[in-house]
Amino acid sequence: HGLSGADTYLEECARASEEVIKQYPNVHPKYDELFNSEILDGVTGILLYKAYETGQLMHGLTRMVRTGESYIEATKDAVDSYLCTDGRPVSTTTSRYGGDKNMYGQFRDRDYRLYLTICPPYMVKKENGPSTADWKYTDNAQDREFIDLMATISGETYHRLPSSNFKGFTVQGQPHFKNMNWGQGWNASQMGFWVWKYYNTHTVATNANGVNTTDAPLFRVGEVMVNYAEAMCELGKFDQTAADKSINK
């Protein structure tokens, strides 16, 4: 921004970040496990976390995400900010990204962290009413595209589709709007982008008294790597070596 002395702070950021990266050179390969694990002690890339324990310190976030009480959602701008699988933004990508003509195209070939933060689109059949766990595939192949994809990138009790509420009732689809919800008032949003970052099915969600005990990451080496990359870029020193130390992890 043309301020004097800025390089002093950028140089220090790069130096300090590199020291941390030397001690913690890798990130955890399963992004969603960082936010949905009962124990973060020893997990790759975790620098500091907050531990929760039954009878001592608990929270209700995991349950809330799977109820109608959650109003955590994203904007279209937030969705568009995620890169595509070729490393390019949506404005210049050569991937299969399909723009915003429909939700399937909008989510296609995107950074997997998008899928693990904002629920991808899908649709299933619910033949026995909204308050049941049963479901079937529709006759439209697109409706199962992300059901199949999530089964390959997320663990069985993490971000699998179709999603379910705190009682195990299967949600018919996403986008799932609060004011047009197929008789299912849960796992819904106002704008169509339901945030499910803290969603999992291995944590007990039937108790409304805030008894969840998944640990919370406070500082991750991934954040340090981004700081390093940005500082090196501002200093005009970002090259392949810097990329391989940071954003290519």
What is each residue range found by the language model?
Residues 2-170:
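An aromatic- and glycine-enriched ligand-binding surface/loop that stacks and positions planar moieties
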Residues 26, 36, 102, 128, ...:
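Detector for Asparagine
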Residues 170-220:
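Active-site beta-strand/loop architecture of penicillin-binding DD-peptidases
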Residues 1-21, 48, 114-119, 196, ...:
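Extended, hydrophobic/aromatic-rich amphipathic alpha-helical segments that build helical scaffolds
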